[in-house]
């Protein structure tokens, strides 16, 4: 199990090779936990003007500062998703094992609904192997 971040990916690769080489255990799929869902929005298109236009579409007023803040948040989220995808791809290239990607749960507490969401994603990932 790993996270789609540089250091955890490095550690997963090193650990996997050590386990296979020293212990002789054949490894199964790698679970990549905390993956942000992909967005249709590239980071470069997250602008204050786009936030203002989107707000007008749903008839909501946002100030210039709010539009700027929304654009910054959207750009950050898109950049984080791109980084995660790149790290998961790097993991796949360095460690030729199937991956089961679990979603990031956007909540402060894990309850029954979140456990079900993660379990469903895990089962779907297994079925896709």
Regions found by a protein language model. Give the residues of each.
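C-terminal accessory extensions appended to soluble enzyme cores
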Residues: 99-101, 105, 109-129
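Conserved catalytic-core segment of NTP-binding enzymes
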Residues: 1-94
């Amino acid at each position: 199990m790993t996270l789609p971040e540089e250091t955890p990916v490095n550690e997963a690769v090193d650990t996997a090779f050590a386990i296979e080489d020293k212990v002789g255990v054949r490894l199964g799929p790698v679970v990549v936990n905390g993956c942000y869902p992909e967005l249709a929005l590239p980071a470069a298109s997250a602008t204050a003007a786009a936030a203002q236009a989107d707000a007008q579409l749903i008839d909501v007023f946002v100030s210039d500062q709010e539009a700027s803040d929304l654009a910054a948040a959207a750009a950050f989220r898109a950049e984080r998703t791109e980084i995660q995808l790149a790290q998961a791809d790097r993991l796949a290239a360095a460690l030729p094992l199937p991956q089961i990607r679990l979603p990031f749960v956007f909540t402060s507490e894990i309850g029954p609904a979140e456990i079900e969401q993660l379990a469903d994603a895990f089962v779907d990932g297994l079925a896709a192997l």
